[in-house]
Design a protein with these regions (language model features):
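Structural detector of well-ordered beta-strand residues that form the stable sheet scaffold
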Residues: 176, 183, 210, 256, ...
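Residue-level signal for inorganic ion chemistry
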Residues: 38, 55, 76, 91, ...
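Short acidic active-site motifs
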Residues: 68, 218-221, 419
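Rossmann-like NAD(P) dinucleotide-binding subdomain of oxidoreductase/dehydrogenase enzymes
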Residues: 142-277, 332, 414
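Conserved C-terminal structural/oligomerization subdomain of aldehyde/semialdehyde dehydrogenase
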Residues: 1-4, 56-60, 89, 228-229, ...
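ALDH superfamily catalytic-core signature
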Residues: 204, 239-394, 457, 502-514
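N-terminal Rossmann-like NAD(P)+-binding subdomain of aldehyde/semialdehyde dehydrogenases
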Residues: 2-146, 317, 342
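Structural signal for hydrophobic packing residues in well-ordered secondary-structure cores
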Residues: 80, 84, 99-106, 110-113, ...
Length: 514
């Protein structure tokens, strides 16, 4: 039977459900509005908003101007003053009601995420579930975290498109729970519709949240440098992150800037290849479009044949395709490793990096192909990229020093432990690293030399949930660390002159357990 878009995820049906659930958040043309000054308004200049799944237009994203954003920030900062008079029990109650509403709309939000950012169903559901369970944990645990601390003020959030709920919505709700007013910018590349319902439900529950959309550069003066913003939470690339960091260093403002580094997996005197293969396969979730993806494997030369025996079959087994397709109306949505990348521009960027590396002498170990049976006939597949793996990428290539943020791996062969450590520290600071080694002592010794915030031994590390701290070393992270009590500390203050845990220009203070 021919493939079709599953009836349960037809876009027209989903947007109908969405407008019925939160009609106040949509204009007369059916497109989302911004949540400014406590009201859904300001359609701005609508910009085409398309899905990477098949290139079709989903709607128009409102692009507001700087002055409108400044008004939104001014109102949100004033709203903080009244929010500080709401006690913790009431804040808990309102956040809990919001979580109940999010849970009731879980399927709708998950389906929206599939269209907006191309996640297969299981990953889209996981994004929503981790948001809900994570904020629930804070509702239960936050009271001792707030002892002796007061909220900072208005928190501004500028986040990437890849985790609209488990990162952005989660942070917003915890920041409000801690007593702060919150404003966020919708990621331009994805999350417009899914975040619109989340913020509409939060606003209905009496939470002091605002949502704006527009060009990051155009709105930076309002959302970053504005004196009414007490703290900034940023998730994105190094180039934008560096510019933001430079604008904040001489200002009395808290910041948490999560950027990227090259996350490496080192293989040294290791034998459990089946376990490593399972880790590698899991690591391909969402096409490695996340800041904690492992994109570089540094392998002892004598182990390279056995490593490739475990590694290459994983790449051949990966299932990539349109996540919305079924072969009959009542069939379940497909189980895929990943769908499209976020847009065709990203695919083109990765192909250029790949061509540059091969042209400079890198060895092409694997170049996957898309299976046409996982797409509609004639559909746009320009945002899809099968996995690629390169051996010995020359040092003068961008792939050697930069995180690809997509399904391109690089393999480096070394002979000595010192080389292993040097190659794993290529970006002079990153978020996660791992060592595969049969000897725990050797693994710990190597791990101690890595410029990585988290180091795993025979396992991959990730952002983590609940009480697990998250941060980065070197250029991969600037400002306060987050996760567990550190997230609450980052948006509250105690005594004057407090030195938060984090990575700052004049000091780095690391948690004992990470």
């Amino acid at each position: 039977m021919a493939l079709m878009i599953a009836p349960s995820v037809q876009w027209e049906q989903l947007t109908g459900q969405l407008r019925s659930a939160v009609p106040e958040a949509f204009g007369s043309d059916g497109n989302p509005l911004n949540l400014i000054e406590g009201q859904w308004s300001h359609s701005g200049n609508g910009k085409r908003y398309a899905t990477a799944v098949d290139g079709s237009e989903l709607g128009r994203i409102p692009m507001i101007d700087l002055e409108t954003a400044k008004r939104a920030v001014k109102f949100a900062a004033n709203e903080h003053e009244s929010w500080t008079r709401v006690d913790l029990d009431e804040r808990r109650r309102r956040v809990s009601v919001c979580l109940d509403l999010l849970r009731a709309h879980r399927n709708l939000i998950s389906y929206l995420l599939m269209w907006e950012i191309g996640k297969p169903l299981n990953l889209a559901q996981d994004d929503v579930d981790r948001c809900i369970s994570g904020v629930e944990w804070y509702v239960e645990q936050i009271e001792p975290m707030l002892a002796g601390r007061t909220p900072l003020g208005l928190i501004s959030n500028i986040a990437s498109w890849n985790y609209p709920y488990s990162v952005l919505m989660h942070a917003v709700l915890v920041q409000a729970l801690a007593g702060n007013a919150v404003i966020a910018k919708t990621p331009t590349d994805g999350g417009l519709f899914s975040l619109t319902i989340g913020f509409a439900l939060a606003r209905r529950c009496g939470l002091p949240v605002s949502l704006v959309s527009g060009s990051g550069g155009a709105l930076s003066e309002a959302l970053v440098r504005n004196q009414d913003v007490a703290a900034l939470a940023f998730v994105g690339g190094k180039s934008n992150g560096r510019d933001i960091a430079a604008s904040l260093y001489d200002r009395d403002k808290r910041y948490m800037l999560e950027m990227e580094g090259v996350n490496c997996y080192g293989i040294w005197d290791y034998s459990n290849w089946n376990d490593l293969a399972a880790q590698i396969k899991k690591g391909y979730a969402y096409g490695k479009q996340r800041c904690t993806a492992y994109v570089r494997f540094v392998v002892r030369r004598s182990l390279l044949p056995r490593f490739l025996d475990a590694y290459l079959p994983v790449l051949k087994s990966l299932k990539i395709g349109n996540p919305l397709l079924v072969d009959s109306p009542d069939a379940p949505l497909p189980l895929l490793d990943f769908g499209p990348l976020i847009n065709p521009r990203k695919v083109e960027e990765l192909r250029v990096m790949y061509s540059e590396a091969v042209g400079a002498g890198a060895i092409n170990l694997f170049e996957g192909e898309l299976n046409e049976d996982r797409f509609l006939p004639g559909q746009d597949i320009s945002a899809y990229l099968a996995p690629i793996s390169l051996l010995n990428v020359p040092r003068n290539c961008r792939l050697h020093h930069n995180e690809p943020f997509g399904p391109i791996d690089s393999i480096v062969v070394v002979d000595r432990v010192e080389e292993l450590i040097s190659e794993m520290n290529i970006s002079n600071g990153n978020l996660v690293s791992s060592i595969a080694c049969d000897d725990p002592t050797t693994a710990r010794e190597i791990g101690a030399e890595l410029r990585s915030f988290k180091v795993g031994i025979n396992q991959m590390r990730s952002r983590g949930d609940n009480d697990e701290v998250f941060g980065g070393m070197g250029a991969s992270w600037k400002g306060c660390f987050v996760g567990g009590s550190y997230l609450v500390q980052s948006v509250t203050c105690s005594k004057p002159g407090e030195r938060p845990y984090g990575n700052f220009p004049d000091y780095t203070l690391l948690p004992e357990r990470r």
